[in-house]
């Protein structure tokens, strides 16, 4: 299992509320409702940024998405689907600053702590 972790920044001109409305209300359902895409994704998480206090996050980023795939090859297959370039890329352009995208594919976590010691 691998995870795609992306730091997201909203497109210039969008309010934070508009960004979240599109990301949570339109983008996620688009992936979920497209079988050619959904079959590749094991889990799709959306994390809103905590804004108070101001020092609680990476300044300028509005959220993080974490998408789980069985393998790197499965992630590559997801992005190679024709529906990805037909639906997802144009939708991302509606609400994301794609130039500010920061992403990484990670392996299964090494758990350093799991609850109080």
Predicted regions and their residues:
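Macromolecular interaction modules
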Residues: 1-117
């Amino acid at each position: 299992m691998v995870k795609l972790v992306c730091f997201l920044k909203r497109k210039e001109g969008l309010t934070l509320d508009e960004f979240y409305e599109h990301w949570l209300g339109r983008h996620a359902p688009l992936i979920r409702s497209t079988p050619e895409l959904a079959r590749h994704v094991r889990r799709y998480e959306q994390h809103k940024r905590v804004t108070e206090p101001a020092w609680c996050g990476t300044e300028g980023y509005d959220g993080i998405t974490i998408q789980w795939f069985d393998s790197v090859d499965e992630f590559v297959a997801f992005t190679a689907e024709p529906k990805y370039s037909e639906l997802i890329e144009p939708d991302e352009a509606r609400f994301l600053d794609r130039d500010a995208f920061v992403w990484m594919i990670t392996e299964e976590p090494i758990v350093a702590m799991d609850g109080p010691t």
